[in-house]
C-alpha cells in the first residue's frame, strides 16, 4: 500500500510518518508498531533492508503501513536516506524515527508534531528515553537537555539526541544532504551536526521512548567503527573555544580503548535511579 499526505488540521497526523528501517526481526517490528497509541491515524513506512524472509506489514488498528523493499541489504544509512526521499515524494512533512524492538509512549507523535508546528526553526526534536533490557527491564534513563543552545554546546560530549526518539523535518533533512554513509555507524550524529549548522534541534523533557539495549547485538567491529566515525566528526567540526568539545574528544578516545561492557556498567551505575530515603 502506498499512501500520500494531505493538508493536516492541528489534531491530525496526516503529514507525519513513522520511519523504521528493518533487517529481519519480524517479531521486533510487530512489537514496535503495536506500541503506537495515538488519537489519529498513524502512517508508517518500513524500509525493509533486504530481509530474508521479507518483512510483512502487520495488521494493526489505527495504523496505515507501507513496506518499501530494498533490493539487497545496503546498511541503515542507505535505508534511511531512501526512506526520507520516499516520504518527501509522498508529501509528508515530518518523519518520526523508531527502530525495531523499541516502544513508543502514548501520544508521542502528537506531542512532537505540536511542538514542531509551534517552533518552525526546530528541524529535529527528541524526547527522554528509558533504556531497557531485551526482557523490558529498566536499565537507566536518558534525560538530555531540552534547549537548542545546550544541545549545540554539548553535542560531542554526551548523547543529546536519542535517534529513535526523533521527529525530523523532512525538507530540512534533505536541505542538508539527507542521511549519508560518510560516517559509518554514526549516521545520526552526522545528520544532527549538519542540521544544527542551519537549524535548531531540541528535546521535549518527558518520556517518549523505551529503547531496547541489545548488548549481544553490538559487535566489537561495529562499535569501533562507530567510535572512529564519531572522532572524525569531532575533528571535522571541532570548536577550540568550547571546553565540551575538548572533554568529548577525550571521552571518545577513552571509549576507543575501553571494553563496551565496562562502559555500560559505568553508565548503569551513573544513570540508574537512586532509592529515596
Task: Cite the ranges covered by each PLM segment.
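Glycine-rich, basic loop-to-helix element that forms the pyrophosphate-binding segment
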Residues: 70-90
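Hydrophobic targeting segments
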Residues: 14-20, 35-36, 42-47
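Conserved donor NDP-sugar-binding/catalytic core segment of glycosyltransferases
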Residues: 107-139
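Short aromatic/hydrophobic "clamp" motif used to bind/position activated sugar donors
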Residues: 95
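Short, well-formed alpha-helical segments that are part of the catalytic scaffolds
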Residues: 24-38
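Hydrophobic/aromatic residue at the end of a short beta strand that borders the catalytic acidic motif
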Residues: 98, 103-108, 131, 168, ...
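A conserved acidic beta->alpha catalytic loop
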Residues: 48-56, 72, 99-102
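Conserved nucleotide-sugar donor-binding catalytic segment
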Residues: 21, 145-231
